[in-house]
Amino acid sequence: MIPEQGEHKAFVQRNTNETKIQIAISLNGGHIEIPESIIGKKRVESDGVATQATSSQTIDIHTGVGFLDHMIHALAKHSGWSLIVECIGDLHIDDHHTTEDCGIALGDAFKQALGQVRGVKRFGFGFAPLDEALSRAVVDLSNRPYSVIELGLKREKIGDLSCEMIPHFLESFTEAARLTVHVDCLRGFNDHHRSESAFKALAVALREATSPNGTNDVPSTKGVLM
């Protein structure tokens, strides 16, 4: 849990000619809501797979791309976030704009919710297995956006999400959040498992990086981050 120097919540809207997105996030979990849904009657019977409400978290992901919903759900769950994501995108073209813009909007929301990097560990790493797959993620809340994502995916698609867009989502998130992120899938033969273990490993790393370090200091020799 992030030190209680603020609510660590954000509400972000991103509207372009390609996508319309709104995101509500609380990095410490708890109750969140959005002013008004943009999805409405566009919800379908398959919706609800990436929806979860517990005493500590509210998660509701609707991007229009099922496997992307699944990955963002895993990221939020294991990061300890409460997260609502709604997107209406130009999926009649392909999944590129929706996936990329959701990554950008989520990164922006994370950055706004985090605020000044103070009193946290700054660095975090995590390993996550999923059956035969094992992934490692290393994070720096650096204000220096850079990512190296090596998932080794072989399939063209998982569900309705192009495999090339899976690392690109993580790259887009990293850039907007202004993080340094390295994610590597170390082993595994099932691309679903490889991808999911990578998102879970990133969640573990983010949770550690944003956890208290026992001070109220900025964890940098520069004296400022973000």
From Swiss-Prot:
InterPro entries: IGPD_sf (IPR038494), ImidazoleglycerolP_deHydtase (IPR000807), ImidazoleglycerP_deHydtase_CS (IPR020565), Ribosomal_Su5_D2-typ_SF (IPR020568). Its EC number is 4.2.1.19. GO terms for biological process: L-histidine biosynthetic process. Pfam families: IGPD. Gene3D superfamilies: Imidazole glycerol phosphate dehydratase, domain 1. The keyword Lyase applies. It is an enzyme of class 4 (lyase). Keywords: Amino-acid biosynthesis, Histidine biosynthesis, Lyase. CDD domains: IGPD. GO terms for molecular function: imidazoleglycerol-phosphate dehydratase activity. It catalyses: D-erythro-1-(imidazol-4-yl)glycerol 3-phosphate = 3-(imidazol-4-yl)-2-oxopropyl phosphate + H2O. SUPFAM superfamilies: Ribosomal protein S5 domain 2-like (SSF54211). Pathway: Amino-acid biosynthesis; L-histidine biosynthesis; L-histidine from 5-phospho-alpha-D-ribose 1-diphosphate: step 6/9. HAMAP family: HisB (MF_00076). Belongs to the imidazoleglycerol-phosphate dehydratase family. This is Imidazoleglycerol-phosphate dehydratase. The gene is HIS3.
